[in-house]
Amino acid sequence: MADQIAISVLGAGSYGSALAISLARNGHPTLLWGHDPAHVAELEQDRCNKAFLPDVPFPADLQLTADLQQAVQAAPVLLLVVPSHVFGQVLAQVKPFLRPDTRIAWATKGLEPDSGRLLQDVAREVLGDEMPLAVISGPTFAKELAAGLPTAISVASTHDDFADDLSLLLHCGRSFRVYTNPDFIGLQLGGAVKNVIAIGAGLSDGLGFGANARTALITRGLVEMQRLGAALGADAKTFMGMAGLGDLVLTCTDNQSRNRRFGLALGAGKDVNTAMAEIGQVVEGYRNTKEVHLLAARCGVEMPICEQIFKVLYEGKNPKEAAIALLSRDKKDE
């Protein structure tokens, strides 16, 4: 790959903006696309994302557009950073404008709504089996990445050369380390399941259960992640890395996590809608909980923590009763 390669980042929220800022700082021609022309005009005028990253100015050469055709045709690499529930929709909109050399990656963490399918399956259904695909995942908060604080992630792809190219594209020796990982399934799965467990960690803390309970929940949540991964053919080692344990610990323990804050609000007695409104941004874990529930049921995998969180969010179960249900399960070996 050349020293510089053009890339279009699709999704101008906090994480999409942070990735675009990092890529532009790396010297790569970067175009940031947002679906709302008024929002993009505001970003262009302010030269920063005032809503989410007000203290981080856009690099001078970072370009912005609300024209999807322009964004897709401007670069051979597309990086989708959109909520999981619109992932397939955005790919369908992208498809008519694809270049012959287009390769597609995503930083979206989640599964397909109403089916629980992996995003790779959604992408292949829309784009066919020949399109090179990749996923980036790991413990990253947008504010810290945009501020240039030390960060590490992993990238996996259907094509080894694409994974290598993406790692070179994203890697910044000063602050951003990128590892390649051959486990395409595991990286996708870790990002979805950790969101659910993070809601559980917030619930536990909101109920005042303390550090012991939070740590037990993280540890057993990792087991559930590995269990589901094994059923889908993922490598168990992946879940001990950036996209598994790393992302899980980050989102379960730091209040920058929307999923954790959502759980905290629920644990404090607020209902789902009120808690969601307080966050003011997409809480991916809310939808991920249903998606993981569907996927686990289809695979016949027992995930008791994720199941109790599903009951709280979608069946109105009292959070304290859900915690009691977990603690009162039959004795078993670790």
Swiss-Prot record:
Please give the function described in this protein's UniProt entry.
Catalyzes the reduction of the glycolytic intermediate dihydroxyacetone phosphate (DHAP) to sn-glycerol 3-phosphate (G3P), the key precursor for phospholipid synthesis.
**What name appears for this protein in its UniProt entry?**
Glycerol-3-phosphate dehydrogenase [NAD(P)+]
The pathway noted for it is:
Membrane lipid metabolism; glycerophospholipid metabolism
Name the domain of life.
Bacteria
Q: Does tRNA-binding show up as a keyword for this record?
A: no
Please provide the record's keywords in A-Z order: Cytoplasm, Lipid biosynthesis, Lipid metabolism, NAD, NADP, Nucleotide-binding, Oxidoreductase, Phospholipid biosynthesis, Phospholipid metabolism
Single annotated GO MF:
NAD binding
Q: Which family does it belong to?
A: Belongs to the NAD-dependent glycerol-3-phosphate dehydrogenase family.
The catalytic site is made up of 194
Q: Name one GO cellular component term.
A: cytosol
Compartments where located: Cytoplasm
- Catalytic activity field: sn-glycerol 3-phosphate + NAD(+) = dihydroxyacetone phosphate + NADH + H(+); sn-glycerol 3-phosphate + NADP(+) = dihydroxyacetone phosphate + NADPH + H(+)
Q: Which PROSITE patterns match?
A: NAD_G3PDH
Residues involved in sn-glycerol 3-phosphate binding: 109, 138, 140, 194, 247, 257-259
EC number(s): the record gives 1.1.1.94
Q: What class of enzyme is it?
A: oxidoreductase
Which biological process, per GO, is one annotated for this protein?
Answer: glycerol-3-phosphate biosynthetic process
Residues that, per the record, bind NADPH:
14-15, 35, 109, 142, 258, 282, 284
Pfam families documented for this protein: NAD_Gly3P_dh_C (PF07479), NAD_Gly3P_dh_N (PF01210)
Which lineage ranks, top first, belong to the organism behind this chain? Answer: Bacteria, Pseudomonadati, Pseudomonadota, Gammaproteobacteria, Aeromonadales
